[in-house]
């Protein structure tokens, strides 16, 4: 349209030529489309482009969208076409009724790369011609047929989307499902005969005036000349705008009602001055011109002359303004849009006087144009209703709803009103919903138009802005009253408002020349923006001084509306400036435009201020419209009456903006309007192009700029009911233009606040009456087809559907009939609100634009009204992007659309609900106490929820809604079931853009029904809803992420919690409505939730609820059915594999998605509470798993959940039936045969088991493939899953112990050979033998035979063991600490001790490879073994030790793998046995050997054992990556010097094995803790393992491991120290103590590793068990140290005596030795005492410095903590504690001279050889010495021993309780480093252990210093996790 030439149209008398000129002016082409079908010329826009497509096999590569634009009823009945034709042929134009719905067809989608794409066809291009054949008048199917029937080439003439007025105007509707922008050329749409019904009375009035084109000499005439104004005589083919003074009833037409007929050949819209102006003029009907069809009209509008032809010649200012509008179009290209508006823009500009403008220039003649009614002349009908009915019948058989609305309105409205209105209609027939005469002062009668017409009250605007036919129809029906609003909207929309140049003629008639401010395509495109322009336009129309009016309008303009940059305050002074070419400044220009007529200026003040200025405001700021203002305009009809006559100040005050708009009248008002206009201008900036169509138009355009406001503020059309009398806007427009200057002025002067108040009052009245909204609702009902109406509707926004409904119910809705209606500002209120929120408006439009206008209108009205209310009542309404007024739209909004009755239907759903607001408008959460639950009667209407205290008769519907009602807009809302917000049941959460609410329904069905209804109503506007929903969803996601980051455990614990991610509250709420257990991330949460839900609970439904609420938090509901504990075939199946349980599928996928790089995945336990909660939720038959729930964020919980699932299977995955077969098959010696047998057995599994196993093994293989990252090698995974998958239903301890290696190996093999096992190629020979050997199988499988005899003894442990074996879930961190656990540990230790003894008797030469970790262990073990063996030959007990080693290795690998829990038990028992047992080396080594399996240090009793143990410890340390190996080495070395050393070696070896086993099973710290192994820790670990089996989560150690830090427990710390010191003491005293200690550490570590708790035991800084925690980086790092240490210790073991080792230990622990110096000589009694103490300490697990041991323990614990080890398990070994104390003493003394350490070592030496000396005594002495800081260097033997022991003891020296923890820690940490210091050999050993790297003491200390096994160098102490823990 911008290209439209501003050709001066011929005299108005020559409509046709002006029309054509106009079209040419606008487009530079004939505006045939707009002008009339006969003038089917290109658009006035730059014009259609031709696209040639060649057919391909895929077709032409594009799809079309159908958008039917229904001409307004008024247009049809008024025969706007006829009028246009008549104007061209004077009323002989095609009858409006001939106007058929215009099928606008535009490109929906272009296939990329297709012919269309290549040809440049774009989505949104409107199809104008197909192969040269116009699509206008053709149905969609016909067009499709044309295209499909085309030859290989298809030639399309398309209007680019950006230039397609229909789409621009109906941007919202066009893309709604029911509203496609008309894609055909508007020119094809037959120009509706001018719908200008010259009102007999107002015939000369406004309509005629505006239509009359002033002499071409006049500025207006010039504008017209530039833009031919189509007078009745001038009948452009497309559309022309004729301003016809619509004589309202003389009374009402205080001002001549100028109805500008925008005559589009296709659509004749009488541009009634915006309802503001024209509303009174009685015909919104004139708007009947379909907005969509308006395109032609718009093009026609280009004809300024028509505008000029406005009937009122009196106005000094030529109507040229209208013409300028056309030019504006040209300039802004908006004109093009106006054409798309159908008659509005162009018609407004070129509006032939409809009948009159074309027929006769005289203002009065606008009615005269016989065509206005085309077939139906409103004048011929006594009542508007009749007219509308007939017209509808003729036109289209108008939409049902429209008809109903019209009928209702007509019925309610008085004939007089309609007659009065009719003239306006006449003017506005073509495009104007109602012409000014329709709207004009016949406000009441005008109100009689159909509500929809009322709604379309601003016919001019609407005309200019193509509306859906329904809108047009509505406008026509409601035109008189709504004209203003509609015109307004249209103006606002148009941006180029055809400024209704309303000149108040001397007779008081105003010429309303709608100068179309350049309504830009964009504006056109976005109905909202355009509508504000329309509003501005209407405002300008309404205000005599458009220029000024825009200003006031601006003030009214909604803030949301952008004021076009050009749109400056439309100053009344600009009345004449209207001519000025600059459209956007046009706000003032518009004022000028309005001012063009002096009368107009005056009148504009009232009218303009009311109509026009609101228009501007509405347009510009319909937002500003002060919603009240627009709404006032909406109610304008009433106000309009008032305006017309009294222009009720209040009404106009709403319109005060309008008043302000009348520039001349009230400059201040203008200022406001200017503001608003700016908004409008912003909206209409695009429109502005249209604004400047003609020079004068340009001037006017400046004024019009308001109208062009980019932001199309939906001017709230007064609901017809609301303003039964012409809407204020009508009044303001028409009266302002025509008659009431003073009144307008008065109104204008009302401040926005006053207007708002008035508006609010009106709304209230409307609510009260229930009828006030009727008119408004209709007016506000957005037409689906017409974006304008929606915008108008938005303007009117407050008119709720209920109002519409009430209209149907009551005559009040009729604008004409109910002048008071204006009092109800509802429609007015939010129209601009809607505009403010384009998004809202679109949604509303979409909602409204649901094909059925009435519905959409209804909803729109409701929406807008609601919005207005909300806007007035609550600022949040705007936020609500939701049109709150939309409530009226029923769930079946479509049905509502279908019929008026639907429109008037009450509510979609209503009923009592408990309601609580969760967040305030500011997004702040509201506590229940502040806003408790309240029972409210909730009515769902359209897109709004009305909350009432009690059920009210819904007479007023939403319009009747009382102030007390709370309105919640639901457009774009998110609604979901709330589980976390409250404990209440059946609660659903409604989240709007700004607030959150909870509603409690009576039952689930009711809740679901509400949710469905709200979703349906809230999503009526797909586009906007999607946008709003996206915003909300994004907001929720952000909140969710915040919540997750802040509290990952705060997810809703609802069984489903399916939408938690969307829950904004979730972050804030911890309670669940159900009172169901929260995801037990923490019990605290649940209590918090309970607290939160208190208010929710406040209205408890029943005692049961209370009971449930109170009970649930504390007790778990029994799991019934569902997923866990049921057979595989009963589990909910995965979506893609019916044989795989859903839980398995989900967990595996989540782990693969997020956990492949998670260290220790499946090893690290998850939160037991969370797991339990998830299990409960899943057991509730929740097949829909919301993996977005934060509960599914914790990978450890997910992995534990998976393990728990398999653990709880009634029939294990490998089935009870085949369990023994699998075990036997695994024991097949031939690897190939073994694999084949296993495969055969697997294939024999039931389908569910087979598929699940296949799926799981594939998953585990995937995990193992990422072992580099997650450290979970097949063996580690096998350790975790073996006992879980390969088991029997009954937890058989014997099976667990005996079959654990098999279980591990089977699973490991499955993982490694998954492809082979589950491939169909059974013939393939398994390649696993070598591979497995190389990987894990090469490692010895732990031999658990020695454990079996003790199984019975350890009655407590079976479950624990089985749990640990399961290791799926670990016991709670404190599990070891429990007295029961302690006891079970004791039992385990005893049994393990005995088993260890037996095992020692049965030496195993070669460990069996069980898993990768075992391999690692074996590697270390072998290394150590070689060393140990080297030592062993030196040792007496070499054989014995070797056996022990072999056994230990086998046991450690096999047992550890198979029975970590058992091993733990064994270790614990061994330790306890050792502790209890005499220092006899044999017993201890034996005991230690089983611990070997678990902990290599377990064998400290014999010197021989000690070296072995040292070796084992080294190995274990290597395996565990902890200090254990060092400690064990230290112990072993210390043992070495003694005879026991070989055994110790064996024990050490065993310890290493145990450690490795442990490490294998529990990736964490078994090795680390090996030195610190303690019988108690072991037992607890066994228990924890057992528990872990029962519980979902893995043990703490695993968690610690997952954290990447050595997992330690207090017991472990104790164990470390104990192991070290104990081993040392045992080695020295009995050489067995330390090994046992180490063994304990290992055992403990092993169990903990198994469980995850063991890891803590590995606490010795040597957590490096790479094997144990291959997965753990820490463990690997530590393993390196361990290896070094192990090697060193091994070396020391090999060659050095226990004394050397002892020295090494001393050296490493030199600082501590100070304290322990006194205890240099361990005494056996002391040893036993130490054991006792240790037991005591164990019982006292948490005692800090018990006997000084506690303090050391504490220190060790600190050290471990320093190492980031959080978990505290009960300290397991009292012996260790004592030793820990010693160790602490060493640590303390470590700083002291190494001499002292040497002394201590020396003291210890005597003990070392005999091992009779108890380490405890020695440590005590050392401690004393430490305190005295006397340390005697120990011999190299002792150095080595101490080196080894030091490492061990660094882990757990127990004797020096007094030693400071820091020293202990230091000693522990430096153990490795000290060891190197001790001696080269010891250093090597330590280096092997990894100590050498860390050990300073080794290097720093002399061998003598290191000789003190209990002394750890500061480094060792620091390194020692135990110390850190302490």
Swiss-Prot record:
InterPro entries: PDZ, PDZ_6, PDZ_sf, PH-like_dom_sf, PH_domain, Rho_GTPase_activation_prot, RhoGAP_dom. Residues 77-162 form the PDZ domain. GTPase-activating protein (GAP) for rhoa and cdc42. GO terms for biological process: Golgi localization; signal transduction. Residues 906-1019 form the PH domain. Residues 1-41, 211-236, 353-378, 416-487, 571-592, 640-704, 868-905, 1044-1107, 1330-1381, 1396-1416, 1512-1540, 1573-1598, 1626-1658, 1827-1915 are annotated as: Disordered. Residues 452-466, 1083-1105 have a biased composition (Basic and acidic residues). SMART domains: PDZ (SM00228), PH (SM00233), RhoGAP (SM00324). The gene is arhgap21-a. The keyword Iron-sulfur does not apply. One of its GO terms (cellular component) is cytoplasmic vesicle membrane. Its main location: Golgi. Disulfide bonds: none annotated. Keywords: Cell junction, Cytoplasm, Cytoplasmic vesicle, Cytoskeleton, Golgi apparatus, GTPase activation, Membrane. It is found in: Golgi apparatus membrane; Cell junction; Cytoplasmic vesicle membrane; Cytoplasm, Cytoskeleton. Residues 441-451 have a biased composition (Low complexity). This is Rho GTPase-activating protein 21-A. Residues 10-22, 216-236, 353-372, 416-429, 468-479, 640-669, 1044-1064, 1512-1534, 1639-1653, 1866-1902 have a biased composition (Polar residues). The keyword Cytoplasm applies. SUPFAM superfamilies: GTPase activation domain, GAP, PDZ domain-like, PH domain-like. The record marks 1163 as: Arginine finger. Coiled coil: none annotated. It is a peripheral membrane protein. Residues 1126-1318 form the Rho-GAP domain. GO terms for molecular function: GTPase activator activity.
